Amino acid sequence: MNLLFTALIVVWAAWLILKKYKPQTVLFVAGGLLLAGSMIMSWGTILPAGKSTGMWSFDIFELIRTLFANRLSGLGLNIMAVGGFARYMDKIGASNALVALTIRPLMLLKSPYIVMSACWVLGMFLGLAINSASGLAMLLMVTMFPILVALGVSRISATAAIATTLCLDWSPSDTGTIFAAEIAGFDPVIYWHTFQIPIACAVIPCVAIAHYLTQKIMDKRDGHIVRALDPAEVSVNIETEDEKKAALSHPPKIYALLPIIPLALILIFSPLCLPGIKMNIIMAMLMGTAISMIAQFFRTRDLKETFSEIQIFFDGMGKQLANVITIVIAGEFFAKGLTSTGSIDAMIQGAQTTGFGASGLTLVMIAIIAVCAILMGSGNAPFFAFANLVPAIAAKTGVAASFMVLPMHLIASSARAISPITGVIIVASGMAGISPFDLVKRTAIPMAVSCILIVVANFVIFG
């Protein structure tokens, strides 16, 4: 009975999310229904013994309050600090300076499709400092896209490479990485170094080759003629105010160092390098913002304007709270509902009885997240919703939580780039003047290679 009830709620919630209902609201409502059903049918409890308010209907809201309190003081503040810093870097043009500086060595290469693949690899490493897939794609469309097309690459091939440059959310300051590290029980830097880097080392060269072959073959199939153009002749559609600012911003070259300050601080003062000095993500982001603010004052000589621009940092924090942290909390609330009905225990027991085991459950969850990421156009929403189930499943199946959460997180970001409705695809295709549906035909093969390699590498290296 409990399995049937849970299945109906889960299917209903999935249908609503696919119909573009607000994911946070759907997860909160579905989680509340599961908890209510669990209490009415005496399948489980909502709060631990001694924590109840005395009325189970009140316990549901007390659980939400507890989740908000716990998440906002730890994981939530980390995510908000990262979001605020990223917005401030965009505001002062530091992200643009970093991209403009790092693409210069690529000018020395003459083969159009090698330059295109190298641009994709460069974008993957830029993603360590610039965590927004859409933001990074926008910057590369303004700076690198005209160069690629001028070398002879077709507009759609250049856009496909740029739109997939952050197909692995593998930065230690990425919101998904921070969350995955907490689920796995590791410091974000240790998690990044121990688990994400080995996967990235397997994925990056293979996807670069896949891009080279896919785009070259499909350009030839479509009758594209490789010929050099003047970069000034290559048009880029700049429609939004943010895109205009990114295109017109010409910050000092030294600003290229500002986005990497927090990353450098996190890595240097970590157990990997200098374990005697403590550094956390929030401190690194605040220090990076303070240094950037000083640099901005010397650039503008306007103290009032410099102080005023810091509002962007706070706005960025608020945006992360509204868009990311609420999904994390809603997903955790939904997971509590699933657990309270006993469905997770039943699923694990069924898997063990049939010999499916932890590996089979991991593959099923990976597949669900990949499909949801494509249909929803978001990697974070399905990952944050399902990742909260990992600790319970891992504990009862005897595998490390990192073995399950690692491919779930990375698959979400790769599958996202196959969706025609995801932000990065819409931004890149709009600036290139092509259809997002045509674009995902070019991103599908390289991203499929990425997804397969993530799973295989995870099983080979950590299985």
Regions found by a protein language model. Name each.
Residues L98-A100, S134-I147, T175-A184, M347, ...:
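Re-entrant/interfacial helical elements at transmembrane boundaries that shape
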Residues M141, F145-A232, A246-A256, A400, ...:
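Membrane-core helix-loop-helix motifs of multi-pass transport proteins
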Residues L3-A14, L27-L34, S38-I46, H193-I312, ...:
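Long, contiguous bundles of hydrophobic transmembrane helices that form the permeation core
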Residues M1-L3, A69-G76, R104-A118, L151-I156, ...:
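Membrane-interfacial loop-to-helix junctions in multi-pass transporters
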Residues N78-A81, L108-T143, V328-F333, T354-A392, ...:
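Hydrophobic alpha-helical transmembrane segments of multi-pass integral membrane proteins
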Residues K22, L72-G76, A86-A97, G127-L139, ...:
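Short helix-coil transition sites and intra-membrane helix breaks within transmembrane domains
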Residues G50-N96, I282-S343:
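Core transmembrane alpha-helical segments of multi-pass membrane transporters/permeases
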Residues M1, P48-T53, F61-G74, P188-I197, ...:
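Interfacial loop-to-helix junctions that mark the boundaries of transmembrane helices
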